[in-house]
Amino acid sequence: MPQVDPELFDRGQFQAELALKSSPIAAFKKAIRQFREVLDNRFNSGRDIRRLIEDRAWCVDQVLQQAWQRFDWGDDADIALIAVGGYGRGELHPYSDVDLLILLDSEDQESFREPIEGFLTLLWDIGLEVGQSVRSVRQCAEEARADLTVITTLMECRTICGPDSLRQRMLEVTGSTRMWPSKEFFLAKRHEQQRRHAKYNDTEYNLEPNVKGSPGGLRDIQTILWMARRQFGSLNLHALVREGFLVESECSMLASSQEFLWRVRYALHMLAGRAEDRLLFDHQRSIARLFGYEDNDVKLAVERFMQKYYRVVMAISELNDLIVQHFEEVILPCEQPVQIQPLNSRFQLRDGYIEVTHPNVFKRTPFALLEIFVLMAQHPEIKGVRADTIRLLRDSRHLIDDEFRHDIRNTSLFIELFKSSQGIHRNLRRMNRYGILGRYLPEFGHIIGQMQHDLFHIYTVDAHTLNLIKHLRKLNRPEMAEKYPLASKIIDRLPKPELIYIAGLYHDIAKGRGGDHSELGAVDAEAFCQSHQLPLWDTQLVSWLVQNHLVMSTTAQRKDLSDPQVIFDFAQLVGDQTHLDYLYVLTVADINATNPTLWNSWRASLLRQLYTETKRALRRGLENPVDREEQIRQTQTAALDQLVRNGIDQDDAEQLWSQLGDDYFLRHTAGDVAWHTEAILQHPDDGTPLVLIKETTQREFESGSQIFIYAADQHDFFAVTVAAMDQLNLSIQDARIITSTSQFTLDTYIVLDADGDSIGNNPERIAEIREGLIDALKNPDDYPTIIQRRVPRQLKHFAFAPQVTISTDALRQVSVLEVIAPDRPGLLARIGGIFLDFDLSVQNAKIATLGERVEDVFYITDARNQPLADPDLCKRLQAALVEQLSQDNGRDTLPTRINF
């Protein structure tokens, strides 16, 4: 513990303060406030963090001793005040709990009831956050035997007041010879760690990690030390060096990593003003500045700070794996004779774990640094890597240099891993964990731990990349065919599956360099393929996939797939069925690996539609594209056949169709045209809007809910409709607006419920939506109030200036208004209100929400059904939209852009 430090706590001054005051509470509070201020100032000036948290524990010791002495415990009383847990280790952060054990020799607590109650009340009154228990030595033993948490807490203890003999007796009766022998304790702690990691999705790379509990956090270091304490009776990292579980460099790395996390945790407590171990968005920017990071042209300060954080916790995880594996080999020796199974002259299995046959294997044959992972892919029964071999891998990474990277033995081994029938993701992840992957591919090393400060990308770039490969592997499993029917079918017939894994590995490799990462990554991918002797066609395919990996998703979500020109342009880009197949599968995996919430039934259906229409265009031949008239004729013929079968008069149908215009038949399928036509012809002419609701497809995982509205047109129709849908808690994904020559509107909205799923076959919910929309449209003057829902906490920290762009589509005679803005509750309804104010009509809309941002496209016309031609009107419209969308934003606005 620290030496006496009068600046932190001066006993003489404190006693004088007590003598001057009638109540001790003020003196105690002043002393606590004083040492907190001094320690926080020392932290801000960069003082050693280990000393700071030890000093804080020492200060609390002084306060507790002074408080304890104010009560009469009797002469030679068998009662002691014991510090346990983190405080027992002598470590205390600004708002950490002060964990105390009041330890008695006897279970008869009655004689001490009054002073104990007075003591604890005083601690409460002076503002100390304490966690306390009152137990006898025997009770400690009973509870420790039954509870892993209790035995762990009691292992870390020291006496603050009273006889230390009580603590010694307690340690004796709870020692490993009496309970929780090291084997049992190790198994329980390992299981506890596995459960804790699972709670955080088994990744160090959560967007808002818990500095204490997430994988690679402080608890992982403490777990190692607890295991060591139970086995060896030692409780510090240097003891692990003496016992041969760590080498000095690893010990130093763990110690420096621990100190980094301590500084982060200390800063979190200071900024939050309370105990806070979550590195929330609220604090990430502030801590980045506190740690001296600044924005530059390529990365934000917060991204650079978080990359440092992620690399630290990844290093801790790597060493935690190594040490826990080493403990397992020592603490859990196999009761059966050791089973040795040779694999080749370099590797063998020992009780199911792979190890080198000689300590100099990697030095003599460096290619074995890659071979070990290929062997594990070929032998999926291998449980893992022996601890000594993990250390040899770590210590031999320097052997991977340019000569190594261009050696045909090594390039062949790496490609062989991608051709494995299983284990690709698992072993790439191992390569990353042991530092081999980033060493072999320096471009991959640059993206390790690199985050993107948004809600769209919830993983670091390297974690996302490996998740993508994991998802590609999952698509091969039969059980995935239900959720991903098309992708599962396609991936099975890819001629060279290894190419899509290579493209997946490289698709985001150039993130964080500035510039277009797709273009830069394509160059890197081409260089990789060439250095690994891939044929020209394979090289060109991989490079093309990396360059275009975003195109299919962007086309599906932002363009009108009913437009034959959109399909033709995309078909020209892909060129053939093989490129289309590879790109579709890569796109599905990329979306799922970016953020699981992004993949919903509507996005799935859009991608399927784009894939299917493009496949049809390729089969027809790019030299023979479908023209608009042919598509309209095909749709009408198929719809009419269906209507006639249902008893609808052909003349009535054609009379209705004559009022609709070409766009209607281009934007809807024959089935939808028949559905709409039959319902309209049978709908009573009483002014009540017609509202139809059905699923877009019967495929469970590739669907949205289609709401069709037929009613007399009115200038506020879109605004009223989207506001009503907002009130009904519906998320609009797509809108198609048609106005007939008879001034009726035929609007189709694709919606999802708040949970991201389609409405489904829920009669009560369907009735609620239908009635709500009819009521709103029958009473448009009672414009639905936009619901003022609370902006989620996370969204508040990703505010940016809205961007509004207006251009003209001369072919379709509409203005294209693009909005990029922070996502907010009721945002689409707000936009609809602005359109109403400017007397604008919406012809079509594509809605996309990407994490914390929306990227919406509206095809609009003015009151004369013409594109917006007045520059002044466009500027006023932009200004109104930016002002509305900037509410609750907290950021200055950016310039907008008009392209005529």
UniProtKB/Swiss-Prot annotation:
- The chain positions of domain ACT read 706-789, 816-891
Write the Enzyme Commission number(s) for this entry.
2.7.7.59, 3.1.4.-
Q: Which reaction does it catalyse?
A: [protein-PII]-L-tyrosine + UTP = [protein-PII]-uridylyl-L-tyrosine + diphosphate; [protein-PII]-uridylyl-L-tyrosine + H2O = [protein-PII]-L-tyrosine + UMP + H(+)
**Membrane spanning residue stretches:** none
Query: Does the keyword Transferase belong to this entry?
Result: yes
Sequence segments annotated as region (Uridylyltransferase): 1-342
Domain called HD: residue spans: 461-583
Stated role: Modifies, by uridylylation and deuridylylation, the PII regulatory proteins (GlnB and homologs), in response to the nitrogen status of the cell that GlnD senses through the glutamine level. Under low glutamine levels, catalyzes the conversion of the PII proteins and UTP to PII-UMP and PPi, while under higher glutamine levels, GlnD hydrolyzes PII-UMP to PII and UMP (deuridylylation). Thus, controls uridylylation state and activity of the PII proteins, and plays an important role in the regulation of nitrogen assimilation and metabolism.
| NCBIfam families xref list | PRK00275.1, UTase_glnD
Return the protein name. Answer: Bifunctional uridylyltransferase/uridylyl-removing enzyme
- Provide the species name: Pseudomonas paraeruginosa (strain DSM 24068 / PA7)
